[in-house]
Amino acid sequence: MEALLNPRYPFDPSFAAGALPAYWVSPRHLAGDDGRLCDVVADSLAGLGWTSLTAVRGRRDFDELGDHHVVRSTVLHISPDALRWAQWVLADEPFHLGGLPVAWQVSARSDTTSSLADWSAYFTPGVPGEAITEFLLALDQCSQPTTLYDGPELVLATAAGNGWLRDADQPHAAAMHPTFTARLSLGEVPPLIQDADPSALTAEGDGQVAMGWQAWAEPAMGAPYLWAASFSASVPHRLVAAFAFSLSSTAPVLRRVLPESTRDQILCAPAN
């Protein structure tokens, strides 16, 4: 649930976002997505010259009120070289991460002859749009979006450089915000995370487990996640580092609405 930053305004979805007062908010990992995650990311991709395609599908549902048609639409954004793409899938009833539906799925492949992605990354609503945009900008600038140049230390060093703390028990695999409200961790990926490289599996016990980066925000211990992100095992660490840099940045972000669950944990200053 989101709430307006200005308490004088009752929460009313009919308000146009542009008519609401703007505030600078920090920390950004608790600032939410301003209710504009689709538009913010789509605008950034358009600025990079990616092509967008909209798929609209319909189905017939039956309930106690009779049958009715439900229209679902997803938007696919494709890079000029067709090696990378991003898809807004929230309306398509996707799977969940941390109890939250996936909103954006970003994928890349090594060549256009393959119909399958080499790796994918997933973001739920609530992820700061700035962090996803930074990830996509780094992806767009990669001449080889599936090549692993750097190790996982780059991700941790990036977050630590912005003041995040390494996990004392996993100093080479996890970092967290000093308030323990957000975490980056290299570990077993959740089910349904797609990755084409079988060598990315790491043997643990009697089976094989795919290891990838996970990130999430938990406003309070045991509270529902504010957002979650998952990167499959073959996502280049330098791209995750770009996401981590933006996520852990101490610079405030512009917001008009914020998550109800973090209103007591953020700092706000009028943008004007």
Predicted regions, residues:
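Terminal, regulation- and interaction-focused segments at domain boundaries
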Residues: 2-37, 137-147
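Surface-exposed interaction/gating patches
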Residues: 146-208
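Amphipathic alpha-helical segments
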Residues: 32-56, 131, 150-165
